[in-house]
Design a protein with these regions (language model features):
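C-terminal amphipathic helix plus adjacent low-complexity
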Residues: 167-205
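A donor-sugar binding/catalytic signature common to diverse glycosyltransferases
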Residues: 101-144
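Active-site-proximal region of nucleotide-activated glycan assembly enzymes
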Residues: 1-30
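Donor-nucleotide binding loops and adjacent catalytic segments primarily
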Residues: 29-111
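Short glycine-/small-residue-rich Rossmann-like dinucleotide-binding loops
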Residues: 13, 56, 117
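Hydrophobic/aromatic beta-strand patches that form the interior of the parallel beta-sheet core
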Residues: 7-9, 22-24, 77, 92-94, ...
Length: 205
């Protein structure tokens, strides 16, 4: 199917590079709501650091929730962990399907901790915040995505066992202190749309 197309677009990170007409940057959904409004809806002050714990849309109950209280100067938001909105001190648990748009949560956070996946990577990339990323050994693309994070984004890798045990929580201050990566490149979706528009106008080939 790929080879039968007349024009080819790939988006970074690319797992299998080929001869293409355009390699665009990471493509992510844009936030719908401003950072301050999202934090207000969550009940989190702008002055308080917020860390988003995400498994990329997969419902997941975390066994380390109680340990998050040890970092009481930081608010943690974990989607997919419960059936309804819960506020437990400095921890906010959200249901798998909530009123909060995932890119909005990423944009409202100061750092993200979660599994390596394309959509989360792209959202964190454009939010320009640190990423504590969990490699998934059973997924072939995990190594390529992790390499891209290491070369283009702030943050560090977290072993799956360390994540599940909650030992990573001690490194939250280190994650928040990571220097931000400032960039002005457009969302890959815009670059791809511009390319298609030029094709329709007869300006690309």
């Amino acid at each position: 199917l790929f080879s039968s197309a007349d024009f080819h677009i790939q988006t970074a990170p690319v797992c299998s590079k080929g001869s293409v007409h355009l390699t665009a940057g990471p493509i992510s959904r844009k936030p719908r709501m401003g950072r301050l409004q999202v934090r207000e809806n969550l009940g989190i002050s702008e002055q308080v650091p917020m860390v988003l714990i995400t498994m990329g849309g997969i419902p997941k109950h975390h066994g380390f929730i109680d340990q998050l209280a040890n970092q009481n100067e930081v608010f943690f938001v974990a989607p997919g962990a419960v059936t309804g909105f819960q506020a437990l001190g400095n921890v906010i648990l959200l249901p798998h399907r909530s009123d909060f748009f995932h890119p909005d949560l990423v944009n409202a956070a100061d750092a993200v901790v979660g599994k390596v996946g394309y959509s989360t990577l792209a959202e964190v990339y454009h939010a320009q915040i640190p990423y504590g990323y969990i490699k998934r050994t059973r997924f072939q693309e995990s190594e390529i995505l992790s390499e891209y994070i290491g070369n283009h984004m702030a943050g560090f890798a977290i072993d799956e066992r360390i994540f599940e045990d909650g030992d990573w929580i001690l490194r939250v201050p280190e994650l928040l202190d990571q220097p931000s990566v400032t960039r002005e490149d457009p969302n890959g979706a815009e670059a791809a749309a511009d390319f298609v528009l030029k094709l329709l106008n007869g300006d690309a080939g």
